[in-house]
Amino acid sequence: MEFLPISWRLQGKVALLAGGGEVALRKGRLLHRSGAILTVVAPQVCDELLDIVVRSGGSCVVRAFESADLDGVALVICATDDRSTNAEIAKQAQQRGLPVNVVDDPSLGDFIFPAIVDRSPVLISISSSGASPVLARKLRAQLESTLPARWGRLADLMARFRQPLKDKLSNIGARRLFWEQTLDSPVVEKVLAGKDSEAEAMLAAAIESADATTLSRGEVYLVGAGPGDPDLLTFRALRLLQKADVVLYDRLVGKGIVDLARRDAELVYVGKARDKHALPQDNINELLVHYAKQGKKVCRLKGGDPFIFGRGGEEIDLIVAEGIDFQVVPGITAASGCASYAGIPLTHRDHAQSVRFVTGHRKDGSVDLDWKHLVSETETVVFYMGLVGLREICSQLIAHGRGGDTPIALVSRGTTNLQEVITGRLDQLPDDIEGREIHAPTLIIVGSVVSLHPKFGWFKP
């Protein structure tokens, strides 16, 4: 981030606005709405800005800027039509340690104004970090059209009931879960429909019947994070990820996905490379139980789909044995996601009538598969975690009847901006990549459908 979004209480603070024209007027309106006291300095000041200054309880000085104008102010806005004047005012303000905004010239200042969607007390700020104010305004317009006007009333209602809920529930986790459930309840629709008294009665009744024991009960979410691209995360996965108190994630989950977790969530890295586990599987299982028994909502975030070579079944075994509530959220498995991004349809009427997923290595590191059932010319075979065993995979397929000229693809870091697709022949690919640096995770696709990659390959990172 180039700029840190913050919410700053300006009520009762003096803001110096250098400039008296249309640009200064726009900033003056915004500052007045925030409760700031305006001091305007400019050789000429438009009537509307002068009126805003009076209503804010501030003052207007009709002359050029002087250093003494900086005395006693909390922030400075430079909005004159002269860049050198703006630069000089900004320089003097910064020498005093005052935060400065230079309109339409962020390089000279310390902060910028975002586009704002105002549903007070709910505020949404949108910024392009000065790169494209037009883009920020467009995003704001889209949000304005979709966000109900009465969200602010809902926030006010929740604020009024915060203390009664604290009196009822001492556990902060239980209170957070109560509010999450409230936001999925008919209370919201009542407020949005203008039926405030009905909403208030429903909320009061819900607080009265709130059960700390039930709300404090731990739960485990086994969530498939998909093959890498955060855009492939499901809505349910995102919702539970942002609800979790603790997130256990492994190497196959990209940082862009982990960053979607709640800012105050505890993040626990558990590794899970092919043969180098930061934590053994048994320890991971025990951690899930440990956190859940503390009453926490635990998200076990796994690359791909939890039930397709994700060892999700092993993790659920202990959870079930301990009587802990759990949910399983499917994810787009690597075979589907990586093949799609590589432009390789796993089935095709003219090439393959079936597809088979197999693991490229076992617990002991071997590649011991039922090879005779993997050589059908009308079937696509996808190998997970097969990079280390690639040479053996190719030789065994050929030895059991698959043609040496069968197309094969190796997809590295699929669906991400670092995706690489290497195609070749079954009898040549191991030699083709000898000495090349191939990054995990990888996926191997064998079958004539691979020949469609040059034609269908649409993703160009």
UniProtKB/Swiss-Prot annotation:
Protein name: Siroheme synthase
A molecular function (GO) term: precorrin-2 dehydrogenase activity
Source species: Alcanivorax borkumensis (strain ATCC 700651 / DSM 11573 / NCIMB 13689 / SK2)
Disulphide bonds in the chain: none
Family note: In the N-terminal section; belongs to the precorrin-2 dehydrogenase / sirohydrochlorin ferrochelatase family. In the C-terminal section; belongs to the precorrin methyltransferase family.
Lineage, highest ranks first: Bacteria, Pseudomonadati, Pseudomonadota, Gammaproteobacteria, Oceanospirillales
Pathway(s) the chain acts in: Cofactor biosynthesis; adenosylcobalamin biosynthesis; precorrin-2 from uroporphyrinogen III: step 1/1; Cofactor biosynthesis; adenosylcobalamin biosynthesis; sirohydrochlorin from precorrin-2: step 1/1; Porphyrin-containing compound metabolism; siroheme biosynthesis; precorrin-2 from uroporphyrinogen III: step 1/1; Porphyrin-containing compound metabolism; siroheme biosynthesis; siroheme from sirohydrochlorin: step 1/1
Residues noted as binding S-adenosyl-L-methionine in the record, renumbered to the chain: 227, 303-305, 308, 333-334, 385, 414
Oxidoreductase keyword on record: yes
CDD domains in the cross-refs: SUMT
Taxonomic superkingdom: Bacteria
Role of this protein: Then it catalyzes the NAD-dependent ring dehydrogenation of precorrin-2 to yield sirohydrochlorin. Finally, it catalyzes the ferrochelation of sirohydrochlorin to yield siroheme.
List of residues that carry Phosphoserine: 128
Catalytic-site annotation from UniProt: 250, 272
Name of the encoding gene: cysG
